[in-house]
Amino acid sequence: MKLKTIFRQAYRPAILAFAVFVVQPPALARAADAPAAAGQRIVLPAAVTPDHYRIDLTPDAKALTYKATVQIDVSVHQPTDRIVLNAADIVIDKAALSGEAAAPTVSYDAKVQTATFAFARALKPGPYTLSLAYRGKIYQQASGLFALDYDGAGGKKRTLFTQFENSDARRFTPSWDEPGRKATFQLTATVPADEMALSNMPIASTDALPGGLKRVHFKETPKMSSYLLFFGLGDFERVHRDVDGVDVGVVVKRGDTASAGFALDAAAHILPYYNDYFGTPFPLPKLDLIAGPGSSQFFGAMENWGAIFYFERDLLIDPRVSTQGDKQGVYIVVAHEMAHQWFGDLVTMAWWDDLWLNEGFASWMETKVTDHFHPEWKVWLQDLQAKQFAMETDARDGTHPIVTPIYDVLQAAGAFDAITYLKGAAVIRTLESYLGEDAFRAGVRRYMHDHAYGNTVTDDLWSEMDRGSARPITQIAHDFTLQAGVPMITQASAKCEGGVTSLAVTQGHYAIDPGSTTARVWRVPVIAATLGAAPAKAVVSGERPTPIALAGCGPVVLNAGQTAYFRSRYSTDGLAAIAAHYGALSPDDQLGVFNDTASLAYVGQAPMADFLDLTATFKTLAADPVVVQAVGDRLDDLDTLYEGLPSQAAFRAWARGVLGPVFARVGWDKAPGESDNTALLRARLIGALGDFDDPAVL
C-alpha cells in the first residue's frame, strides 16, 4: 500500500511514492478496541477457521447502501458452542449453519468489531457452512465499500471501490479479517447492466436481469488474506495486452484511455522482471491497474491481488501536460504495488508485527526495478534522501524497531510509517549489498517457493538467506530489525603503506534526542573503499577498533556506494581529504558524505566547521542537482537557527557565496534537454537565494 506522499517534496522531489495510512479517516474513526492485556494480541479464537467465501453482493450506489449474502465454508478444529468472526457497521438479518436445525443467537461487540454466533450445543470438529444475509453502508471515504463521485460528460457520476487494509474487509462482509486467516473467495455482484464490475479475478459468466441489471460471477481467487479482496463498479473502459501469459489492463473512467498508456507500458516492463526475480510467475490470469477518480485521501494506492487500486494522479499520464517527473512518480508507484503481488499477496505476514515484510520490500524493490529500466533517472541517488529521512526519524526518542509488537488493529494502523517503509527498504539494501545480489535473490526465490499462498514471520526470510550463505545474516538482520536506532561508524585511524590503507573503525550510536543516547550495539556490515579502488567488506561491532585493509592510498569512504544503513563519522583529516577530491566521488557518495557530516554536526557529534568546509566546496563543484538541493535544504535549516540573531546577516552572506555560483551556472532559462531535477534545482535555488537576500534573484 502506498501512503499519501507526504515526503515527496522534502526528500524525493520527483518520484518518492511513499504512501500508507498516516491517520484514520476522521469520519470513519474506528470504535476503540478493548485494552489488550500486556503482551497479548486481540485476535479471533482459533477454534474455527475459514476455508472459502461465496459472497453475493447487491450495491445501491445512489442510496449508499448494500445488501449481501455470504456462505462461508469453515473448519471447526475443536468442540465449541460459538463462532466468532469480525463484523463492523453490518447488520446480520439471518444466520444458519449447515447441520444445525436451530438458528444461532447473534451478538455484536462494537469495541473489538466482532459478531458471535452462539449455538444451543457444542459443534463437533469438522467442516460446516455458515450462511448469512446482511446489509451495510457504502462510505464516502476510502474504507470498506466506498463511493467516489466525479463530473462526467453526462453530469455527476458515481463509482464504487473497496479499501480493506488493514482491517476493513469486516465492513464489507462478516469475515475472519486477519492476515493469517487466508481463504479462497468467490464474488458475485448484481449491478447496472451498463457499468463495468471488477474484482481480483476475471469474470466467469454474466446473466442478464430485468430492470437494466446484470449478475456478474467472478472466478474463484487463490488462497489469500481478506484485506486483499476487491470490488469495483463504474462507467469504465479498459485497455490491456498480454504480458507473459497474463492479461494486464489499465482501467479508467470512460474517456480517459489516452492517459493509460504509460502505466500499461510500465506494467508490461515490470511484470516479466518480477516473474524472473522472484522465481515464481505471477499466479493470477489477469492483473488490473485501476484508476479511481480524484486525488489521494490518506493513501495513494492499494495492492489488491490482481486488481490494484490507484488514485488517478498516481497512475495516469496525460501526454499533453505531464512532466518527466510525473512519469517517474507513476512508474515507481506502479512498481511498488506490483511488487506487493508477491511480497504481501502471494506470501503474507502472519500478523501486523511483520508489516515491513510487505512494505519495506516493496519500497526497496520499487527503486531496484525502476533503476533497472531507467538508470538515467538516478533513483538510487534520490532514494538516499528517503534514507536520510528514515535516519532522522529513527534517531528520535519516539522511534520503534522495524519488527514491533502489535496487539490490535488500531495499533496496526499506526505501523504504516517511515520506519516500516523507508528504514525497512534501507535495511534490505544493506543486507543485499553485504550478501551480494545473486545470493540475496536466491534467498528471496526460496522464500517465495517455500511459502507461496501462506503466512510468514520475518525469521522465515532470514532462514532462507542463511541457507545460502556462510555470513551471519540472521544475527545482523536481528540487530537492525529488532532494535531501534541508527548505528554510527567512526573513522578511528587510516594509514597507507605500500599501496594498502590500514583503516580502523568503531561502532557507536547516532542520536538526536538526549534520551536516545543509551549505548547500543549493532553488527554493522561496512563496505569501505579508498577513492577509485575496489571496496572491502567487514562486520563492525562495538567500541573496540575493527581493522579493515583497503586497496589504494586515496581518501577513505566508509560507506562506499552509500548502500548501508549507518552514519559515517570521519576524522577531520579524513573529511578534509574527501573534500579535496570531492568532485571525483560518485554523486551517491557526495550526497551520503554530505548528509552524514551535516547531521552529525547538527547534534554535536562532529565539528560544525567540518560541515561548513565541506559545504563551501559546492561553490565550484558541478554536482548533481539532487546533491545541490540537499545543500540548499541544509542551509535553509541553518538560516532558521540564526533567525533573529545578529549573526544571521553574516551567515546569509556566506550562504549566498556558496549557492550564488551554482545558480549562475544553472541560469534563469531552461536549457535544451534539461532534466527535471535541474528544473527543480533552479526553483530551489531561486527560493533559497531569495531567503538569503541575494539581489540576483530579488
Please provide the spans of the model-predicted regions.
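A surface-exposed beta-strand-loop module
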Residues: 89-151, 174, 210-212, 544-551
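Ligand-binding face of N-terminal immunoglobulin V-set domains in extracellular IgSF glycoproteins
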Residues: 67-87
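N-terminal, polar/Ser/Thr-rich
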Residues: 3, 22, 29-67, 153-159, ...
